[in-house]
Amino acid sequence: MAKKSMIQRELKREKLVAKYAQKRAEFKAIILDINSTEEQIWKAQIKLQKLPVNSSASRVQRRCKVTGRPHAVYRKFGLCRNKLREYAMAGDVPGLKKASW
C-alpha cells in the first residue's frame, strides 16, 4: 500500500493539470503556429515556463485505484498487476478470463 501522502500528491497534480490545461494548450498553439512571429513565440515560451511544473500532464503517474501502487498499472482497469490477478481469479472483472492455449 502506498503512503497516503503520495496518493494525495498525485491527486494534487491531476487537479493542477486540469486547471492549467487550457492555458498550456494556448501557449503551445502559439509556439507551434507557423504564422507566429519570433517575439510571440518567445513570450509564449516564457509564459509556459512560468506555469507550475506539476501542471504538466507528463508529471502525473498512474496509480492503482486499490493499493496506490505506481508500477505495473493497467490503464484499461486502473489496477496494478497484483490486484488485477487477484480480482480476475475471484471473477470480479467481467469479461476477463485466464488465457489457455
UniProtKB/Swiss-Prot annotation:
GO process annotations (BP): translation
Gene3D superfamilies documented for this protein: 1.10.287.1480
Highest taxon in the source lineage: Bacteria
InterPro entries (alphabetical): Ribosomal_uS14, Ribosomal_uS14_bac/plastid, Ribosomal_uS14_CS
One GO location term (cellular component): small ribosomal subunit
GO MF terms held by the record: rRNA binding; structural constituent of ribosome
Biological function: Binds 16S rRNA, required for the assembly of 30S particles and may also be responsible for determining the conformation of the 16S rRNA at the A site.
NCBIfam families: PRK08881.1
Family affiliation: Belongs to the universal ribosomal protein uS14 family.
Subunit structure: Part of the 30S ribosomal subunit. Contacts proteins S3 and S10.
Listed name of the protein: Small ribosomal subunit protein uS14
Organism: Francisella tularensis subsp. holarctica (strain FTNF002-00 / FTA)
